[in-house]
């Protein structure tokens, strides 16, 4: 049985202050959204005009003021500045407070957030970061059983550790992947899979989704048991000039992974991003002023196998986006399911 189509809102913690970010997420429940996800940055992409509220405080604030909205991180790194055992405790508590609504989205991490908070030495290559992620997920899942856990891993250890307040069934873990190796792991071990838009059909239909399928098959799981989430970067506005200009704040996302890998200072990140022309920045986004055109481009991702569409709008006027989403996009998007 195919997964149901879900529509989500990306709460841009790098762009908005804590109170505004909470109010926007609360409003999504009456504007056609099923979920709200939040980024987890210690530092923003931009030094000037940037923000970085604490994701878990945001989740509890939104959880208290909503009734059905699914809430999660997209994504948190439970391996460096966060201890995985403490991360497991935090999400277990939220799972008890908001039953069936909390998930933990995880990734391998970025230097921008970890070096400033005390990581010593050269920033690890992917192999180590991925190994840490896998080990942390194993540990957290053991702790969510509620039993005492003695864990001896390569990176993490616990002695008689137990989480005393755990929701039934634990917490769903969504694994973010930009390539086939981690996507295969998501299919094998994740309750959900997360990727981002704007990188070409071959990545999604030729690499990521087949890898998720392969991982699921190896674990003797159903592909349809995995919630397949994509953050869709969309700048929709009836005014085409505004739709294009709104993407400028998020120029750092258009830097290559190689460019971003070693940058750990938001001032340097901002400088590198602002050297990019607006045309290059906009390539990562669906930039549209016609709702049918916008939804037609979104429909490609559904056709490639994604079912949980989380919309990241780049403009500063998010209330305008929520209204446009409700009137222009949501009715059309629901027909994709």
Swiss-Prot record:
GO terms for biological process: carbohydrate metabolic process. It comes from the Bacteria. Gene3D superfamilies: Luciferase-like domain. Its EC number is 1.1.98.2. It catalyses: oxidized coenzyme F420-(gamma-L-Glu)(n) + D-glucose 6-phosphate + H(+) = 6-phospho-D-glucono-1,5-lactone + reduced coenzyme F420-(gamma-L-Glu)(n). Signal peptide: none annotated. Coenzyme F420-(gamma-Glu)n binds at residues 40, 77, 108-109, 113, 178-179, 181-182. The keyword Ligase does not apply. Substrate binds at residues 196, 199, 260, 284. GO terms for molecular function: coenzyme F420 binding; glucose-6-phosphate dehydrogenase (coenzyme F420) activity; oxidoreductase activity, acting on paired donors, with incorporation or reduction of molecular oxygen. It is an enzyme of class 1 (oxidoreductase). PANTHER family: 5,10-METHYLENETETRAHYDROMETHANOPTERIN REDUCTASE (PTHR43244:SF1), PTHR43244. Homodimer. Belongs to the F420-dependent glucose-6-phosphate dehydrogenase family. Catalyzes the coenzyme F420-dependent oxidation of glucose 6-phosphate (G6P) to 6-phosphogluconolactone. Appears to have a role in resistance to oxidative stress, via its consumption of G6P that serves as a source of reducing power to combat oxidative stress in mycobacteria. This is F420-dependent glucose-6-phosphate dehydrogenase. The lineage of its organism: Bacteria, Bacillati, Actinomycetota, Actinomycetes, Mycobacteriales.
